[in-house]
Amino acid sequence: MSKINLTLDPPYNGEYYTGTEQISGHVSIQIEKPISIKSISIKLKGFIQTLTKIDSDQMFNNNSAMSPIQDNRAIHNIVEKSHRLFPPDNVWNALEGSHKPFKVKPGLYEYNFEFDKMPKRPECLARHKRDTDSFVKRNETRMPPSFNNNWKDMSRVDNIELYYYTLGKVIYIVQVEIELGKALAWYKPFNKFLHETLNIDYIPDAKDLIYVEDPEDYIARNSRVESDEQLIESIQNSLALNNNNNNTNNNIDNNNNRIKNKNININDGKIDNDGISTNSNTESNQVLTGDIGSNNTLMGRNNNMSVNSENRLNEHVIYKSSFSVQLPDESSVMWLEVRSRGLRHTYRRDYLFRQGSNKFDNIYLVLEGDIEEMFKMKINPRKIQLNLLEQTVYVAQGIANENVSSLRLVEALKICDDDDEFGRIFQFNPIQVPSNLHHRHHNNDAHNKKYEVELCLKDHSILKRIRFNKEDYVHRGNRLYSFKTCTIKRLFKFQLLIDWQINDKIRTTENIIDRTQIFCQVREKVNVVDTLPQYVEPPQYTETRHTTTP
């Protein structure tokens, strides 16, 4: 009867639409025989949909049989815009409320359309109730990016991992809707609609994807703010060997999803092998260094300004190993520290190990114990592996499900291929006392001191050239970006694994960079001012007359 063709103008970057551009396109309708049409409209819609399931183990109790497992669904409409293409405004206004259809002759009808820029905030906020479960505060909610656009291709029953992953989605569509005239028959009481729909990829600008950490979660999980004296004391005590720790952790199964209910404490497993003592409190593995001001506010050491939730991202953070490694003398331990200012925000094509990248360019091996016994040991770094851990959480009707997967960035790379490179990257001798403890360490016992050795991965011939997500990788149908919205949050962590040869045994250290925000955009240049080219004086010409004599 009719054929609808919907074409969108390509985005500026040729890949996805952003918040700074308008979505436009062209509609062509081929009508083969006369038809009654009431209206033709073009719509832009966006919605968030989550579906969560209760683990069957949670349905059992001692007094009753298992109840039927119910799915919990939540749908949030975040944007809806509509433009009428037919009839034109002057005709529509002249109808004065009449809903009679128009008899349209066969032929080709074409229309152009253009929507305004995407709003900054979703429309569902106006319908949020006070007790609505949400991962973000009302005043911090922004438009989310497209997520799981290709969910139909991934939600196959033969791949259970992707099936659970696609239970949360953010979809944006452009849709043509043709409302046909009402038929004059009792058995056809409703109007008929014809539709043509296209999915679009929408990713807001990086500044609109930045989410604010929950202050309570930030303090409880990610950092400790301490004065110099408190910092020294905490460094001396926080990673002490805990031989009485009987807590067991589940290993992370790479590329495997786990479903957990909201009331279950979700913890990622840590590597545990012989000779390794796992810290009972992993919350102390990160330390945000700074000074306490007169009003109990954190003061930046370099800029002497109050630090809020935004500029905390630029503070010097120490990411300690998840566990300490016991050395062969059984009285000394060692751990690894990643000291960084820039791992909170990581953009595509950022250098990871290069000097000045503020990522993994400042790494130290810290040892505590008898220095004389340490010098008798052979401690060498052998292999490095860097993983990106993805955590997606969906919530619906008070039930939350979690999915965990892993993406390998650097795979089991040898740290040192020859003696010359080994000397540049790691020298166990000489060993030095940490600079921040050198003048304040009150314990003169040489058998119970802390020492550090720099692991110069920034000088590695391969690592110093590695950029994050240089190829714009698509993981499970989505680019690499973090975001939080009403019922979906997608978070990332870096996991740094280094194998150490201690005498004749291999031990592994693990550093988790928690709550890093990942962006698929390339970092914008900062402090670059567009200026006119330097003025150059134009050349001067002199006129010379040539005369001829008769």
UniProtKB/Swiss-Prot annotation:
One Gene Ontology biological process: endocytosis
InterPro entries reported in the protein's UniProt record: Arrestin-like_C (IPR014752), Arrestin-like_N (IPR011021)
Superkingdom, taxonomy of origin: Eukaryota
Subcellular location: Cytoplasm
Keyword Cytoplasm (UniProt): yes
GO cellular component: cytoplasm
Stretches for region Disordered: 275-303
Compositional bias (Polar residues): 277-303
Main localisation: cytoplasm
Keyword annotations: Cytoplasm, Endocytosis
Pfam families the UniProt entry points to: Arrestin_N
Protein family per UniProt: Belongs to the ART10 family.
Function recorded in the entry: May regulate endocytosis by recruiting RSP5 ubiquitin ligase activity to specific plasma membrane proteins in response to extracellular stimuli.
UniProt-recorded name of the protein: Arrestin-related trafficking adapter 10
Organism: Vanderwaltozyma polyspora (strain ATCC 22028 / DSM 70294 / BCRC 21397 / CBS 2163 / NBRC 10782 / NRRL Y-8283 / UCD 57-17)
Gene from which the chain derives: ART10
